[in-house]
Amino acid sequence: MALSLGLGLALSALVIGIRPQVVVPFGLSALGSALLGSLLIPGLRRWKAGQVIRQEGPQSHQKKAGTPTMGGISFLPVGLLVAGIWSGWDPHWLAVALLTLAYSFVGWLDDWLVIRQQSNKGLSPQHKLLLQVGVALGFCVYLAWQGIPTSLTLPGIGTLSLGWLFWPLALFVLVGTNNAVNLTDGMDGLAAGVVAILLIGLGLLHRDPELSVLAFTLSGACLGFLVHNHHRARLFMGDTGSLGLGGALAGLALLGDQLWALALMGGVLVAEALSVMLQVGYFQYTKRKTGTGQRLLRMSPLHHHLELGGWSEVQVVGSFYGVTALLVGLGWAWWHWTGM
């Protein structure tokens, strides 16, 4: 944890040195998010908007049942609003804001059904995927209307023209990032902290100053949310928060030609998603071959595998913060060294 704190301080110093103009909106977002969360928690408790914990998860998590959820409504609007004011309501800001809110609404609907039914089954996987793809298609229409280059830039390598293949890739990034953040949101402070650090990385590299500010204000909003979400959490972001953050990350990366940065700096999100896909794929493969499904991991996603291996939540979260900070530093150094 000390290493993670040191890396975080070093990253903050880097940000202040390179982008001093984002310090005020970053701070306002953090403060506003923390204050709004404080006001929201009592209301969510009165409305009995408590988290339902799935029985298949680690048994140690059952004690978290009833913790207020839907916390995404306490920080996403703050980060979006501060960025909107700072950017003068820039059209690209509006597009990413609408994308974020649309995915957040899908998540809110899922959270609401979970609370209403008092089970961990909200939207069916099919309905959820259909809504996610629908939102992604809408954003792709905006990208095409804006004439976004259908290419992929790799620092030190060059620009690869993808043509029509760019659009399936964009859909995959939008839906995949959504689900990756959602899967990562399984421990106190994990998703909020990892995404906060990742947003700083995207903000440092973004060529669009308005979208750079948006990345930093959303990062600040995540930081303010962590006041209530760190171990032991008093508020969960729910799908309301995780799907919204996933949409914001994907939108920022697509508009800034930063898919490489999202993949590299978001390595923790990639690992979490891959761990689930490998676990499910291996289980189904061995079940077909032997009649008995076997598992690669103790439990997926990866953070639960480590937890069941004896790691504490604080150790897992601190390690993932540290890895993300290192990947952000590596991505920034690669981008800077190649002169991109």
From Swiss-Prot:
The keyword Glycoprotein does not apply. The chain crosses the membrane at residues 22-42, 69-89, 95-115, 129-149, 156-176, 186-206, 209-229, 235-257, 316-336. It is an enzyme of class 2 (transferase). It is found in: Cell inner membrane. Its EC number is 2.7.8.13. InterPro entries: Glycosyl_transferase_4, PNAcMuramoyl-5peptid_Trfase, PNAcMuramoyl-5peptid_Trfase_CS. It holds the Pfam family MraY_sig1. It is a multi-pass membrane protein. Keywords: Cell cycle, Cell division, Cell inner membrane, Cell membrane, Cell shape, Cell wall biogenesis/degradation, Magnesium, Membrane, Metal-binding, Peptidoglycan synthesis, Transferase, Transmembrane, Transmembrane helix. It catalyses: UDP-N-acetyl-alpha-D-muramoyl-L-alanyl-gamma-D-glutamyl-meso-2,6-diaminopimeloyl-D-alanyl-D-alanine + di-trans,octa-cis-undecaprenyl phosphate = di-trans,octa-cis-undecaprenyl diphospho-N-acetyl-alpha-D-muramoyl-L-alanyl-D-glutamyl-meso-2,6-diaminopimeloyl-D-alanyl-D-alanine + UMP. The keyword Metal-binding applies. GO terms for biological process: cell division; cell wall organization; peptidoglycan biosynthetic process; regulation of cell shape. Its cofactor is Mg(2+). Pathway: Cell wall biogenesis; peptidoglycan biosynthesis. GO terms for cellular component: plasma membrane. Catalyzes the initial step of the lipid cycle reactions in the biosynthesis of the cell wall peptidoglycan: transfers peptidoglycan precursor phospho-MurNAc-pentapeptide from UDP-MurNAc-pentapeptide onto the lipid carrier undecaprenyl phosphate, yielding undecaprenyl-pyrophosphoryl-MurNAc-pentapeptide, known as lipid I. Belongs to the glycosyltransferase 4 family. MraY subfamily. This is Phospho-N-acetylmuramoyl-pentapeptide-transferase.
